[in-house]
Design a protein with these regions (language model features):
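Membrane-interfacial helix-loop segments of redox and metal-homeostasis proteins
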Residues: 1-403
């Protein structure tokens, strides 16, 4: 049996656009009255707009650097980490002494991070997106990623059930260059590492191309690549999330949260070590979806992408191919194989993100700008997982190619 998504005809286009606009308007009004913290929802919406408008991402930029040696995306990530650290390091060190309760994404440096990030990197490569990228695709109505998201929830929930095992693995404890040493020394060390990595990326691209695509472009009116502005805005938005919610931007914890809410809806017993570990057992499970800070920013991101997406449709009359084309959701052996592979890789991403204390957002971005060493371990392990997966995939394709 086939389930197919169809694009509407041109004659009914304007009417449906008007109905969609009304639906979005009423939905936003309802959300504004229902959410526990409207500020976090707005910040999430802003994140979605920035990601979509500037075509910013993580997984795609990493893949591009590894396969094509085009590093402008990864260099924009380093800029993001530099700007974020300038904002986070002094704040994490000084604000608590002034009576402001803020905490960084600081986690132990352990085998669970090494293994979890590697698993996430493998899944991210096969799916073609990370957690934030999945939310972005959902906002752009790419239906495949709703299926991916479902399996990320399943994988994250299974990881929650087994979290006590992962937390018993060897660990070196926590260390943050923002709070465990004078923050200004830590910031200088952080920026020095960023500068060194930036130089290595430049050399990596120069080994393939005569010239390197610059982040500062004289042909642009602002003399900057749009990725620079995106990095600046994302760092500021993450900092505002820290000030509003007392914790940096994160995504991956919504996977076990939604899974446990689903299990509760089915009246199944829950007594898992994961919720004891994060110290949020009763509080987290008692919070509604619209009262949870991580849920709000994640929901806001999907809404923000949708607003930016449909704004482009209304202004330019262009829709992405995944909406405008007719697509078969299920049918035939290839579709079944694709669904099975997507389920496995989505579950890998959800599982890996939870046991590694985060995804590209919570583990990589927020972890590193909080000065936590586990963030750097997360980055290198996820990159290793992606690199090996791409290498194995290339070898597999070459063996299947006709002589």
């Amino acid at each position: 049996m086939f389930f197919t998504i169809y694009h509407s005809g041109v004659r009914s286009r304007r009417g449906k656009e008007f109905v969609a606009a009304l639906f979005v308007l009423f939905g936003l009004i309802w959300l504004a009255k229902s959410v526990g913290n409207i500020g976090l929802l707005i910040l999430g919406i802003a994140l979605g707009v920035v990601f979509h408008y500037f075509s910013f991402g993580f997984a795609g930029f990493w893949r591009q650097a590894i396969l094509e040696r085009k590093t402008i995306g990864m260099r924009s990530h380093l800029l993001l980490l530099a700007i974020g650290a300038v904002l986070f390091f002094p704040s994490l060190a000084l604000l608590p002494n002034l009576g402001f309760e803020v905490s960084g994404a600081i986690r132990p440096l352990g085998l669970n991070v090494l293994i979890g990030a590697f698993v996430f990197g493998v899944g991210m490569t096969l799916v073609g997106s990370c957690s934030s990228g999945t939310l972005r695709q959902m906002g752009a109505l790419n239906w495949r990623f709703y299926y991916v998201f479902l399996w990320m929830i399943i994988g994250g929930t299974v990881a929650a059930a087994q979290m006590d095992f992962w937390l018993e693995l060897p660990t070196l404890g926590t260390f943050s260059a923002a709070i465990d040493i004078p923050w200004y020394f830590g910031l200088l060390m952080h920026l020095a590492v960023i500068l060194g990595l930036y130089y290595l990326l430049l050399q990596w691209e120069r080994s393939e191309f005569d010239s390197v695509e610059p982040l500062c472009n004289k042909e642009n009116r602002l003399f900057l690549s749009p990725l620079v502005l995106a990095a600046l805005l994302l760092a500021i938005l993450n900092y505002l999330i820290l000030l509003v919610s007392q914790y940096p931007w994160a995504i991956s914890w919504i996977f076990p949260k939604l899974g446990i809410l689903g299990i509760q809806a089915l009246s199944l017993p829950i007594d898992w070590e994961f919720w004891e570990f994060v110290g949020q057992n009763e509080v987290a499970l008692s919070k509604g979806v619209l009262d949870d800070s991580i849920m709000l920013t994640s929901l806001g991101m999907v809404i923000g992408v949708s607003l930016a997406f449909w704004g482009q449709v209304f202004l330019y009359g262009k829709e992405k191919s995944e909406i405008s084309e007719s697509k078969s959701f299920c049918g035939g052996c290839e579709q079944i194989k694709s669904l099975a592979l997507t389920a496995i890789t989505g579950a890998l991403m959800g599982y890996g993100a939870v046991i590694a204390f985060g995804c590209n957002v919570g583990g990589f971005f927020s972890g590193i700008i909080s000065g936590s060493l586990h963030g750097w371990l997360w980055m290198f392990s996820a990159l290793l997982g992606m690199t090996l997966t791409l290498f194995v995939g290339r070898q597999f394709r070459s063996t299947k190619a006709p002589a």
